[in-house]
Amino acid sequence: DSFVKNKFVYITPYLDEVDRLKEICDNNEVKVWIPTTKNLKGSKLESIKQALQNNASVIATHELFSRLDKECLEYLNNHNYTLYLDEVHEVVKVYEDMSSCDFKLLLNDKVIKIDEITGRVNWIKEDLYIGRFNDFKILCELGVIYSLGNSIIIWTFPIEIFNSFNEIFIMTYLFEAQLQASYYKMYSIKYKYSSIFGAKGKYVLTSFNKTQYI
């Protein structure tokens, strides 16, 4: 019932699962927005921005969820969304869209600077920039790029995105063994376990049953 009544963002690993969930929602008269490239920018990210701006429920993939930016964050903060994650999200990974040579070039030209304590990469050049490093600039401004040894570049999912949701439900198992559990602990995000009970085609959350966890 809460899935129907509340605005939600449902994130799934697979594109074909998006279509399957859309069909289920249609059959139950639940209106959802599926991001497409049918907009002026030809971008699914632009499409999900339109959905959030219009207070619509959304079904999308983990890949698209990873690309949410400050504009998406603003819309999420202004509306009361619930997040459903089908499996854990990739919250930390090596950033491979920039070569070490280009990274050193930006460092030497004083376009970026690495925080000596945290390792966070900051975009410090104040001039208006539009070029091949624009995506990297946006990530630096989000505060999600870190450097190890001035060469290895690490991307982290912006914790502000998770904090913008009223509630988050993660559908997975052995969560404590997942990187996202450590990520939540690092940011002092509290969570609790629940079990799922199913009967007559309906499923409800119940108190956590440890025997199901083993």
Model-identified regions with their sequence ranges:
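Short, charged/polar "capping" segments at the starts of alpha-helices
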Residues: 16-21, 42, 177-179
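Signature of the SF2 helicase/ATPase Hel1-core->accessory helical subdomain module
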Residues: 62-191
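Conserved Walker A/P-loop ATP-binding site and its immediately adjacent core
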Residues: 3-29, 36-37, 63-64
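Conserved interdomain hinge at the start of the Helicase C-terminal
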Residues: 1-3, 159-161, 214
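Interdomain hinge/linker at the junction between the two RecA-like core domains of SF2 helicases
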Residues: 177-214
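Inter-Walker segment of RecA-like/P-loop motor cores
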Residues: 28-67
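A general structural motif
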Residues: 5-7, 29, 54-55, 78-80, ...
